Amino acid sequence: SFRFFEEIIMRLATLLGLSVLHLALCVLTCTAHHPGLEKSRVSYENMGDEENAEERSCVHERETCSKVRGPLCCRGECICPIYGDCFCYGS
């Protein structure tokens, strides 16, 4: 009878482990498909002195920005909602 309980405990532990792995995979997949779930960071191009701000190809507040494509960075933060285009916030 002890063997029976041991087998049940092993099956439950395996099921629990697989459930945790499945949940982690779902979270990673969701984050990959919806990058707006993570607050975007200021582009490296923005990390400079204020003197040359006009020379950088950055857009202004409430204009569309992009973290991935081209030079469309923000002077503030590029916020990407789950649905719709990314937009600049702040300056």
From Swiss-Prot:
Residues 1-32 form the signal peptide. It is found in: Secreted. Contains 4 disulfide bonds. One of its GO terms (cellular component) is extracellular region. Residues 33-56 form a propeptide. Keywords: Antimicrobial, Disulfide bond, Ion channel impairing toxin, Secreted, Signal, Toxin. Expressed by the venom gland. GO terms for molecular function: ion channel regulator activity; toxin activity. Putative ion channel inhibitor that may also act as a antimicrobial peptide. This is U1-theraphotoxin-Agm2a. It comes from Acanthoscurria gomesiana.
